[in-house]
Swiss-Prot record:
Organism: Shewanella sediminis (strain HAW-EB3)
Gene: rsmC
Record's subcellular location: Cytoplasm
Enzyme Commission number(s): 2.1.1.172
Name of the protein in question: Ribosomal RNA small subunit methyltransferase C
InterPro entries: Mtase_sm_N (IPR013675), rRNA_ssu_MeTfrase_C (IPR023543), RsmC/RlmG (IPR046977), SAM-dependent_MTases_sf (IPR029063), Small_mtfrase_dom (IPR007848)
Oligomer status and interactors: Monomer.
Length: 343
């Protein structure tokens, strides 16, 4: 089943018939594969590891699939398709990336849902593109078309990162935040509560949903001897975390994981401010799976230390899988759950 933006792209497939096409920030469907019904060759870059895993089995000679914040080479394309991102600031980065990989006078297509801010693209397109025009609209989505008219500047990550100092209960740390990664330029309430009641940890510790690396940096500030692994589903977050670690002279293994699936072996501790906040059934199910999978990933005596919005239904899952619910701290918005594996 194709998403609405993907359906809008397919019904305009004559725009890139017989061409070499790059797709940026594609969604959780098989659109890159279906583009081959019209395009000569397709390369797709996903910033979401779950979306990348959905497409991965379909890779072939004319369908190259990548995960990350950049492509591994400097290949240029006839057409670049951008799915307009939820984070508006990320759109500017994707436009720069598209410009770098377009042939001279190459074609740019930008698609997105009306409610997702797609109309902002008209003002966001940089000078090296022609003014975009609305090509089509359907299923509450819009498709804009533009053309590369000047050479785009090369991507320099330092232009897309914000560095700032953050005070934590463990001391001051430097945070490096790439566009599209959650940041308040201060310690958010949930993470502050989590770090204010941080148990002493040991051995191998997993930071799940690491984001820009705030929790890991604070943890290593207090206990530099820990062997921390940082996982996230978002490519920009993973790169941000790597930059944060380098800025603080810390070392940790940072890699993508869809849930805990890509982690290996058992951990002495799992720590997280899980990225499940909206209370929708889909994210609630993911949260429940996180609790269940955590039990399977912890050694005997392992510590599970997370913070969550108090309205989210964690307690039942924790009771089911950990056999008890231990709330070590709470306020009017958040609860810190701190459990141990006893058997």
């Amino acid at each position: 089943m194709l998403t609405n933006p993907s359906q809008l792209i397919l019904r305009n497939s004559d725009l890139f018939a017989g061409q070499n096409v790059l797709v940026l920030n594609y969604e959780g469907d098989l659109l890159p594969k279906q583009l081959l019904e019209s395009a000569k060759k397709v390369t797709a870059l996903s910033l979401d590891y779950h979306h990348h895993l959905i497409m991965s089995p379909y890779a072939e000679q004319n369908l190259a699939l990548h995960f990350g914040h950049m492509l591994p080479d400097e290949e240029q394309f006839d057409t670049v398709i951008i799915y307009y991102p939820k984070a508006k600031a990320l759109a500017s980065y994707l436009l720069n990336l598209a410009g770098v990989h377009l042939k001279p006078n190459g074609q740019l297509l930008v698609v997105g849902e009306n409610k997702g801010g797609i109309r902002s693209i008209v003002k966001q397109v940089p000078d090296y593109f022609d003014s975009p025009f609305k090509q089509d609209s359907a299923r509450h989505c819009l498709l804009y078309v533009s053309q590369l008219v000047e050479k785009a500047p090369q991507i320099n990550l330092s232009d897309w990162v914000r560095n700032y100092q953050l005070e934590t209960p463990q001391g001051e740390i430097t945070i490096c935040n790439l566009v599209g990664v959650f940041s308040e330029k201060r310690l958010d309430e949930g993470t502050k509560l989590l770090l204010s009641h941080l148990p002493k940890m040991s051995g191998r510790v997993l930071d799940f949903g690491c984001g820009a690396g705030v929790i890991t940096a604070a943890l290593l500030k207090a206990q530099p001897e820990l062997k921390v692994e940082c996982v996230d589903i978002n490519a920009m977050a993973i790169e941000s975390c790597k930059l944060t670690l380098a800025a603080n002279n810390f070392t940790a293994d940072t890699y993508p994981s869809d849930g805990l699936t890509q982690t290996k072996g058992l951990f002495n501790g799992i720590i997280s401010n899980p990225p499940f906040h909206d209370g929708l059934r889909s994210t609630t199910d993911i949260a429940k799976n996180f609790v269940k999978d955590s039990v399977q990933k912890l050694k005997k005596g392992g510590v599970w230390h997370i913070v969550a919005n108090r309205h989210l239904p964690y307690s039942d899952s924790i009771s089911t899988h950990f056999k008890q619910v231990n709330v070590s701290a709470e306020n009017n918005r958040y609860k810190v759950y701190s459990n141990k594996i006893n058997s």
